[in-house]
């Protein structure tokens, strides 16, 4: 199955990349943009047919490697 993990900074954590993108958009006269947040998306295939096991495995991957859970949140999507 295909796995999509979206990682983003937690609310309240300064997003310097988001601020830079926001500033760049404003300099291009996109003045109607606000609250820009930049994250990352990790996409991979997982050879697992049991959705519950897949979710447990990917959660562990996120907790151990893919996200810094002190400052980042993550969301997991399983696609059959």
What are these regions (language model features)?
Residues 1-11, 42-44:
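Short glycine-/aliphatic-rich beta-strand segments at the starts of folded cytosolic domains
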Residues 8-9, 28-31, 61, 66:
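Residue-level signal for pocket-adjacent positions within structured domains
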Residues 9-11, 48, 80:
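Non-catalytic surface loops within mature trypsin-like serine protease
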Residues 12-28:
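Short amphipathic alpha-helix segments
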Residues 12-16, 49-56:
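Short, conserved charged micro-motifs
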Residues 29-34, 73:
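A short linear hydrophobic-aromatic micro-motif
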Residues 37-41:
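Short Gly/Ser/Thr- and Asp/Glu-enriched loop/turn motifs at secondary-structure junctions
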Residues 52-80:
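C-terminal structural segments of small proteins and small subunits
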